[in-house]
Amino acid sequence: MNTPIKFTTAEEAVKVIKSGDHVHLSSVASAPQCLIKAMCARGEAGELKNVHVHHLHTEGPAPYADPKFEGVFQLDSLFVGANVRKVTQSGYADYIPIFLSETQKLYRSGAVPCNVAMIQVCPPDKHGYVSLGTSVDATLAAIECADHVIAVVNKYVPRAFGQAMIPLSKIDLFVQDDQPLVEAKFSEPSDVEKAIGAHCAELIEDGATLQMGIGAIPNAVLAQLGNHKNLGIHTEMFADGVLPLVRKGVINGEAKKTEPGKMVSTFLMGSQEVYNFIDDNPGVLMMDVGYTNDPYVISQNDRFVAINSAIQVDLTGQVCADSIGTKFWSGVGGQVDFVYGASLSKGGKAIIAMPSITTKGVSKIAPVLDTGAGVVTTRNHIHWLVTENGAVDLYGKTLQERARLVISIAHPSAQEELDRAAFERFGSHHHYIKGYMQK
């Protein structure tokens, strides 16, 4: 069935947006830039007021968040990316704290209205279906709930399978705009990050199912897994680092209980190579975030290993991953979804991995979290903590035992101060690292 599409211009399409509307934008590389530009032009012309914009992490410009649009556009993001970090910290934009698994529920429950969904899709196939490509996440829920769905048809959007495939009947307005997707570039792992990767890799067994983010530490972990067997991927996102392991047959999904033989994700960031990899690839399923990040679904896979990072960890194992003090840096994301899911998995491991010290020489392990810092993963949820100095398992450990273990993998320059803080907090009847506290 060849379904004809009647295209309109971006300028005409965004006329469905009214003052006071809530507008969802598809995520990461799929942010529909031509529609964003046209929407902002209406704002510049004084045609819109109090339009709420929602999205997860996006790559590329975010002009609607410019302070000059105060009173015109209000960004209430579901994750704070680099392109909106400063305006969020200054108060011109805002953030909705929420587990990634529940972002779709905001729309489906009506807690956040969705009047207009602006998305990108690949050209339709002969059956009248298009693909959301790199962004299913909460975008699928937005499409289901929106009064108007505007789709940019872009030949560069990969034809991904799973719940990314939607019928043309779900879309109200079509705009043609063939633009290469934004590519995310990642630096080579440092020696510290390579050491962290090696410690994490030692915790991964053959037949494990993996979740990890993107960036230097995940890439360092993946680089250490070349001799593993029968690994699987069930994650919220992946990037180029998995591709060598897929080609080598290390990642084949054969041991997975859910979608055996398939890689499962909800959004993607990376180079054109990873976009090409998911194009027309039945071995990759792009699914709704309510599925990928459901702790119960995650837990069905034995030996599930979740690797996430942190900004700061205290002596009891509280993990801050969304803010630096009172300043939001990112968001809750899916960390807790996967930490909890992995902890419920038979033989699973939930890992928080980070350098022991910042590039400015500040210890990331602290006696207490900074004032205003958000607790993302609680001390009740944390299991493994990894730095370049080693890996410690905090599960089932007392507060004093945790303090000793956490200090043992802190940066040497910080251990004496942490020793002293532990002594002052927990009393004098236990010694910690350097004999500051002697029984």
Regions found by a protein language model. Give the residues of each.
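Conserved alpha/beta enzyme-core scaffold
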Residues: 1-439
